[in-house]
Amino acid sequence: MTDWNGPTLTTRSHELRAGREITLKALYSVDVGDIAPPVAWQRCQDAFFLSVSPPSSLSQPQAHFMATGQGIDASIDVARHMLQAIAIERMDIDTIIRKSSKRWRISRMQPIERNILRIGTFELIKGFIPARDVIYDCVELAKFYGDEPTPGFINGILDQICQDNQIAL
């Protein structure tokens, strides 16, 4: 288990959301690209903050940083710690997901869904952030990065994880 005590940010802050988004991109890269977490983290961090995409294609946290330039260090800290912790605890996290997604094998899930669930499960089990806020932000990630059914799928599985692990909503 990791010794990280969670983010020292307010719930639903741009920094926390950006940290999750960078973590998601890095986990996705590790999952589908078969690259080491530190390499994925560095690439995703650089791409997130140095994007040349048009503003309409940026996520809300990314647009915030492009407009203000504030909170970058806090976001990087969250992403780095979260990626390291999830990489270390991935087997335990996947076991929790597997138990709560009775009709879906993790290997059958889309990589984006699988990795949003890993982030959400990690945060729910650690209890750093209120469960409702974790689920809300994971659903927002699913809306931006997933297909049409992805937000409902993420919401349902994370809600089941809360029920199965006696996590108050």
Q: What is the role of each PLM region?
A:
Residues 1-151, 155-169:
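N-terminal interaction/assembly modules
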